[in-house]
Design a protein with these regions (language model features):
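Amphipathic alpha-helical packing segments from all-alpha helical-bundle domains
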Residues: 135-157, 168-175
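Short, amphipathic alpha-helix enriched in basic
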Residues: 26-53, 57-62, 71-78, 82
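Preference for well-ordered, secondary-structure-rich cores of eukaryotic proteins
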Residues: 54, 58, 103-104, 144
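Short, Lys/Arg-enriched N-terminal segments with co-localized hydrophobic residues
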Residues: 6-21
Length: 175
């Protein structure tokens, strides 16, 4: 993949360890920055400016914000997508869908996921615009594929091999 990927992973790990020693609220701080950034994204889009403005609202230094989101806006957008996946999974698990067929479960899961997207339409639209850029397309595809995989796993899919891939690709084309 990328030449700097091992360094990026190592520096993020070192920061998480050192930040955890300083504060046990690493994820809470990331969430605070993210939630503040949602309101800013509507006007400025997903950018480093948005990240730093959200950090300053929460009285977090730019240096620490950059350590939490090393690649700036793209890591913030990835966090946004993963955060909404967590919310989706929590809501979907509350629904009793044992008696439903796989297709009805998929339909219900997509409806739940789209309900979450609608709450922050503009942020979602701007994230899709960012992932349309050639150098971020692979990351966007990975996030969509990850969401589709989470949906199938949550439904209880146990397929392997070719079926595993085709189910996720078909769902990704719908999503």
């Amino acid at each position: 993949m990328d030449f700097y990927q091992p360094y990026y992973k190592l520096s993020t790990l070192v920061f998480k360890i050192s930040f955890t020693l300083m504060s046990t609220d690493f994820e809470k701080l990331k969430e605070k920055i993210f939630k503040s950034s949602i309101e800013i994204v509507i006007f400025d889009g997903w950018s480093d400016k948005t990240l730093f403005e959200a950090a300053s609202i929460n009285e977090i230094s730019f240096k620490d914000a950059k350590r939490m989101f090393p690649r700036g806006a793209i890591d913030l957008v990835k966090y946004y997508h993963e955060f909404e996946d967590k919310i989706f999974l929590a809501q979907f698990r509350k629904v009793d869908c044992i008696d439903l067929s796989h297709s009805k479960k998929i339909e219900l899961a997509l409806i739940k996921r789209f309900e979450i997207i609608v709450k922050n339409k503009e942020a979602f639209r701007r994230s899709m615009a960012l992932f349309a850029l050639p150098f971020y397309q692979i990351e966007g595809i990975n996030l969509v594929f990850s969401t589709c995989d989470k949906i199938w796993v949550e439904i209880g899919d146990i397929s392997v091999g070719f079926d595993w891939y085709t189910k996720r690709i078909i769902l990704a084309s719908i999503y």
